[in-house]
């Protein structure tokens, strides 16, 4: 007895020792794990920068996922794909569904000759079968794809109780009896997609207790009831893509407690209710894109505590409740793209702490701000309609789009060609206009009022060159780190002043060209009229044009709530809008300027020059010097053509883009950059050539100046040679000097006569 007690005591002591030893080991392991976790803490980076894995180095967003190893350890090129949500898991499961290697041996004794058999799996694809064939009852997989089976009668599979998978795609099945799947208690996967099914009777799946996958895609099914899914206690995945459903059952998951994945893409569902997903506690993936859902009640998703991915894209949702996503604490991926949403609440995504991917493509967000996206600390991918929106989510590693056609994450001007052109056109514009101003000031013109108008036009065009120079300068300033300063830049005073300068130059130039055209029109078409503005009237008109241009450019500054950031919609600060993302005020104003004032001015210029050419041609036919008149006609036609052509190059692209935007046609982003940098300044660069350098008056005056300069040079040379002769004669004889003076005097008198 004593021995037993001693043994029992020792055994208890050993158990206690082992318990403490195990506890100590666990503590060590936990400590080690904590240390490991602590050592993996990523370095804190400033806004817009992201860490290089476990290195202390941080890089701007532009250097991540750009195809180059900028970190040195490849961390900046890792995790670039948007793998959040459950799409990857589904692909893996779906892809490996039939991955088990089968032997070529067939274990079925009876099956049609047109079928292929491997072990207990039978494939009868494209066999022209009109009904389910007679086969051995030990079959586990039956594929009857692409046959001519149009109906499934009662108990058609009653003998095949071991069936686990049935594939009935592409048969144009129209009718399925209520007891067609009777007895299939082991069936796990059922494919009925790409058929002609219009209705499914309640209870049709009541014996399919083990069914996990049900695929009903591409069938013209118009209605489903809650009782349709009776018996589907194990259903995991339900797909009804591209059906004709207009409504969902009152409680979608009442008969499917294990339902994990629902795909209802491409139906005609018009509404959801608070009870639609009330019993869908296990749901992790919900796809509802390409439907006609106009409104989602606030508590629609309140019971979906485990939801990991939600897709509501391409619907007609115009407004979201501020607390719609409040209960989706585990949501990883949310797609709201291609909805006509006009407003997002500032706390719309406040509860989505685990969200990793947010898709807001083709959505206008007029009230966008950085606070809207700050709560989503785990957000790694975000998709916007506008590139400039990326500035409001600097903490997100991957932001799309990468450019707006003008700027990129790295540079204000994303295209190397644009960088070169902006300097070339700026130089040509400034130099050409300053040269004309100088020459016009130096050369005295008979028509001083016209010369004054041309000089004022050159001043306006020169402002466009100054604007382009500033674009080039700020491009250099922000080279390689533009996205870091993009938001500050577009909201800065400098950007707004640049936009104001460009708009002032553009509108004053347009109004001046219209005035000069009308002035010329009156002279040529009505040569005997007395409608001729004098110097004072011309000065008043020019002052009014500058005041009108100034007002057009400055009005957007008066009411920011109405116009928004009118000049800060893109990196080059020019208000050339072409999409639906602008404020109502700025949209109406820009349309009024570009399709109102500028289009009207362009049409007046084109009409005037056509009328002038016809008038000149008519006058020429009445003269006798046909040959000379023909030459003059060609010259005038060429000149008028290039004037109209330069206006067309400048403004037609703008008009086309604005008109297309009215019809909601998507315009390529790159088009904006070419219009702003290349097409729009064409007039400013060519006006000096067209209105001064190629005119006959300027050519004649230039020839006179050159001739006068040549005469002065010749006179200086002769005078120099004369002085040499006089010095030599003085050394020789005073008599010769007098004779030479007479000869020289005679030469000088005779020269003008000759």
UniProtKB/Swiss-Prot annotation:
Membrane topology: Multi-pass membrane protein
Residues that span the membrane, as ranges: 417-437, 456-476, 496-518, 538-558, 593-613, 640-660, 671-691
Entry comment describing in which tissues the protein is expressed: Expressed mainly in the brain, kidney, muscle, testis, thyroid, uterus, peripheral blood cells and bone marrow.
One BP annotation, GO: negative regulation of cell population proliferation
CDD domains: 7tmA_RXFP2_LGR8, LDLa
Annotated GO CC locations: plasma membrane
Disulfide bonds: 45-58, 52-71, 65-80, 495-573
Membrane topology, Extracellular segments: 1-416, 477-495, 559-592, 661-670
Cited PANTHER family: GLYCOPROTEIN HORMONE RECEPTOR, RELAXIN RECEPTOR 2
Function: Receptor for relaxin. The activity of this receptor is mediated by G proteins leading to stimulation of adenylate cyclase and an increase of cAMP. May also be a receptor for Leydig insulin-like peptide (INSL3).
Homology family: Belongs to the G-protein coupled receptor 1 family.
Protein name: Relaxin receptor 2
Species of the source: Homo sapiens
């Amino acid at each position: 007895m004593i021995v037993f007690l001693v043994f029992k005591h020792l055994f208890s002591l050993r158990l206690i020792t082992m318990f403490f030893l195990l506890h100590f080991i666990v503590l060590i392991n936990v400590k080690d794990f904590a240390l490991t976790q602590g050592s993996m803490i990523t370095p804190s980076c400033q806004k817009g920068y992201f860490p290089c894995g476990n290195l202390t180095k941080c890089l701007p967003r532009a250097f991540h996922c750009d195809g180059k190893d900028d970190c040195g350890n490849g961390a900046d090129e890792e995790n670039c794909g948007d793998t959040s949500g459950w799409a990857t898991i589904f692909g893996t499961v779906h892809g490996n569904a039939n991955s088990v290697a089968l032997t070529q041996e067939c274990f079925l004794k009876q099956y049609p000759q047109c079928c292929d058999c491997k072990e207990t799996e039978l494939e009868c694809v494209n066999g022209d079968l009109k009904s389910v064939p007679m086969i051995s009852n030990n079959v586990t997989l039956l594929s009857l794809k692409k046959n001519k089976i149009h109906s499934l009668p009662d108990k058609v599979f009653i003998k095949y109780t071991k069936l686990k998978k049935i594939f009935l795609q592409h048969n144009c099945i129209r009718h399925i009896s209520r007891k067609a799947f009777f007895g299939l208690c082991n069936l796990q996967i059922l494919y009925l997609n790409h058929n002609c099914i219009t209705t499914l009777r309640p209870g049709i799946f009541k014996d399919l207790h083990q069914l996990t996958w049900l695929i009903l895609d591409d069938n013209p099914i118009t209605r489903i009831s809650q009782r349709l899914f009776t018996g589907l206690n194990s259903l995991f995945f339900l797909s009804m893509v591209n059906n004709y459903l207009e409504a969902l059952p009152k409680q979608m998951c009442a008969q499917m407690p294990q339902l994990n994945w629902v795909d209802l893409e491409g139906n005609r569902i018009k509404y959801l209710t608070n009870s639609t997903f009330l019993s869908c506690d296990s749901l992790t993936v919900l796809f509802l894109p390409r439907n006609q859902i106009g409104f989602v009640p606030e508590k629609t998703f309140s019971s979906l505590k485990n939801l990991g991915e939600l897709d509501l894209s391409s619907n007609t949702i115009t407004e979201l409740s501020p607390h719609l996503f409040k209960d989706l604490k585990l949501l990883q991926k949310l797609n709201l793209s291609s909805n006509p949403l006009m407003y997002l609440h500032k706390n719309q995504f406040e509860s989505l702490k685990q969200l990793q991917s947010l898709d807001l493509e083709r959505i206008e967000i007029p009230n966008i701000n950085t606070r809207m996206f700050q709560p989503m600390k785990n957000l790694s991918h975000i998709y916007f309609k506008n590139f400039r929106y990326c500035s409001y989510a600097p903490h997100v590693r991957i932001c799309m789009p990468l450019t707006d056609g003008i700027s990129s994450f790295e540079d204000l001007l994303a295209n190397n060609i644009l960088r070169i052109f902006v300097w070339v056109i700026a130089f040509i514009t400034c130099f050409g206009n300053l040269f004309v101003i100088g020459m016009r000031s130096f050369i005295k013109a008979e028509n001083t009022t016209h010369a004054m108008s041309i000089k004022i036009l050159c001043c306006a065009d020169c402002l466009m060159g100054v604007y382009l120079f500033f674009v080039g300068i700020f491009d250099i300033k922000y080279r390689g780190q533009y996205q870091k300063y993009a938001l500050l830049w577009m909201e800065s005073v400098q950007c707004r002043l640049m936009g104001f300068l460009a708009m002032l130059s553009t509108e004053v130039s347009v109004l001046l060209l219209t005035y000069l055209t009308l002035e010329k029109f009156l002279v040529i078409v009505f040569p005997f009229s007395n409608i001729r503005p004098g110097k004072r009237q011309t000065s008043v008109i020019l002052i009014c044009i500058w005041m009108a241009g100034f007002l057009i450019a400055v009005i957007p500054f008066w009411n920011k709530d109405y116009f928004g950031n009118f000049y800060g919609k893109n990196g080059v600060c020019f208000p050339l809008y072409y999409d639906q993302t602008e404020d109502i005020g700025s949209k109406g104003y820009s349309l009024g300027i570009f399709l109102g004032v500028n289009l009207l001015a362009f049409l007046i210029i084109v009409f005037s020059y056509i009328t002038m050419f016809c008038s000149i041609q008519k006058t020429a036919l009445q003269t006798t010097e046909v040959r000379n008149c023909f030459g003059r006609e060609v010259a005038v036609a060429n000149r008028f053509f290039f004037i109209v052509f330069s206006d067309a190059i400048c403004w037609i692209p703008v008009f086309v883009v604005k008109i297309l935007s009215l019809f909601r046609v998507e315009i390529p982003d790159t088009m904006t950059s070419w219009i702003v940098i290349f097409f729009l300044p064409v007039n400013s660069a060519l006006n000096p050539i067209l209105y001064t350098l190629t005119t006959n008056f300027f050519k004649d005056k230039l020839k006179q100046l050159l001739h006068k300069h040549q005469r002065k040079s010749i006179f200086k040379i002769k005078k120099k040679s004369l002085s040499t002769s006089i010095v030599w004669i003085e050394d020789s004889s005073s008599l010769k000097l007098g004779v030479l003076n007479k000869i020289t005097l005679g030469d000088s008198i005779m020269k003008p006569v000759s």
